[in-house]
Amino acid sequence: IGITGSKGKTTTTTIITHILKELGYHVFTGGNIGIPLFNQIENMKKEDIVVLELSSFQLMEMPVSPDIAVITNISPDHLDVHGSYEEYIHAKKYIFKNQRINNKLVLNHDDEIVKNFSKEAKSQVSFFGNQEIKDGFYLKEDKIYYNEEKVIDTNNLMLKGKHNYLNICA
């Protein structure tokens, strides 16, 4: 699982890791989050899950895409390195560039640029956001829903703030 975006990468990576561990999966977390995975490769098994926080710089060097890719949002960032906002957006697309039809791409429906990535995806696409979404998680009236079914009341969450609730939806 790879997570990228201008904001929310670390939080979303941490949330996904926590949820998977709570469900009983053996999870390795790394990438831009500061945990080197190279030393852990020998300990990994085929059934283990790797959750990676991926920066635009890392994405440009990747010859493969993760089976599940998440894009939290995009706003002008690192323009000193990328040269332009368009180049930065292009770099973020590398997370799904090499996905296959049986892979999954999770996009922020509230971010027009990110939402439009669905037009270029070869993989299955689902969305998350602030409005009702078919086949996706969304935030409505302090509750998180999936396909119109309430999953949790945000008052029951330790993390606070609308931005964190959207990270949970991702």
What is each stretch, according to the model?
Residues 84-86, 93, 123-170:
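Adenine nucleotide phosphate-binding catalytic loops in nucleotide-utilizing enzymes
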Residues 1-109, 113-124:
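Phosphate-binding loop of NTP-binding sites
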